[in-house]
Amino acid sequence: MEHAITPLDPLLPSGSLKYCLVILNQPLDKCFRHLWHKALLRACADGGANHLYDVTEGERESFLPEFISGDFDSIRPEVREHYAIKGCEIISTPDQDHTDFTKCLEVLQKKIEEKDLQVDMIVTLGGLAGRFDQIMASVSTLFQAPQITSLPVIIIQEESLIYLLQPGKHKLHVDTGMEGDWCGLIPVGQPCNQVTTTGLKWNLTHQMLGFGTLVSTSNTYDGSGVVTVETDHPLLWTMAIKN
C-alpha cells in the first residue's frame, strides 16, 4: 500500500487536509495564525503556552487552546493562570520518561477519539531550533508517534519541515508552490538498507542510507511535482518551506 501525502497542504489558503495543531516551547512562526484558524483542535505542550500568550497580546480571547499539557516546569505562572481562568483544560503529565511533546500527542489522540473528529494530520509548530538535544527529542517523538496515533505527524519551524516515513512506499506531492529549493532523506534511527526514490534531482535506487556511509542532504526536485520513496526502515523526510 502506497501512502500519499501533501506535506505543505496545511499552509495553503486552499488546503483541504483536516488537522490538529500542537504548539511546542519555541518562538512561533508567521504561519502560526493561518494554522491556528484552520485547525480542528489546538493544544500547547507546556512552555508552548508562553509563546502563544506573548505573541497574541491584545487578542488573546481569540487564541485559546483546547488544552495545555506537560509537567509544567516551563509554563509561567501567570500564563497558566490566564488560560485556566479562560476555561482551557490544564492537564498535568508528570512522567519524566517522555517529553512534553510525546505526552501532548497522547492527550491529543484521546481528545480526537472522544470528540470523534475526522482528522488527516497532526501539525506541530516548533521543535526544530535552539538546543540540539531538544531537536533530537522532537525526532524521537516522531518515532514514538505510530504507537500513539495512526495520523501522520509533521513538524514545522521557520523554513524546515520534517516527517518520518515508515517502512513501505510513499508518494509526496511537492507541487503546492510553497516548497523551497532543498529536501533530504535522513536515516536517523538505524541504517536503511534499501531506499529507492523518484522525483528527486539525485535519486536513489536500492541504495543504503546510513550515518558514516550515505545521507541524502541538500537534494532537490526534478520538477515533476511528485516524489516517491520506498524504504525498508523508518526514514526522515525533510524539506524547505519557501519564505
UniProtKB/Swiss-Prot annotation:
Pathway: Cofactor biosynthesis; thiamine diphosphate biosynthesis; thiamine diphosphate from thiamine: step 1/1. Keywords: ATP-binding, Kinase, Nucleotide-binding, Transferase. It is an enzyme of class 2 (transferase). The keyword ATP-binding applies. Its EC number is 2.7.6.-. PANTHER family: THIAMIN PYROPHOSPHOKINASE (PTHR13622), THIAMIN PYROPHOSPHOKINASE 1 (PTHR13622:SF8). This is Thiamine pyrophosphokinase 1. It comes from Bos taurus. The lineage of its organism: Eukaryota, Metazoa, Chordata, Craniata, Vertebrata.
